[in-house]
């Protein structure tokens, strides 16, 4: 990244390949990189919640293992948040298949807003809370919660595609039952999670409780217990 004043927190979620070994070798030669491991597989959003607690910077953003960021992504987003009252800066993304071909959406467009690209002012987590203990979709729920709390003007969207996302056969967006389809449509489990989370935001937790949401996630096998992380 062209913006070099960054802290990189990486967590290995009990991978079965040599990911942890590779990450540790990088951290050995780059003091900005700190490496953690899950005690037990716990999914991306529990890990994010844990790493947010460890982070020292004023801005938080994320990078999934199968994504590639434009070299100027961090710099552009930092500049927006430093010079704007917004609390989140997002960018577009392009999905690329393993053969290098771009995956278009149902409207024949190649780009879409990328929720994973969100750069968030750290103090927002103290107000809104962290991500739900879900295997999928918790970043979208967080995004919608911020809009309801702070208004749409609190989020700035950069139209440039600053992330390439691998559209391969692995990953939660491709697994049967949790998939986001190539044309932009999503699985039944994702739709139901989105619906119940929206009802909770509108009606309040006295009507739609966290237990209700957890029950739906559990029925689909999407609820994940927190196992913690270790260095």
Question: How would you name each of these model-derived features?
Answer:
Residues 1-230:
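Nucleotide-sugar donor-binding/catalytic module of glycosyltransferases
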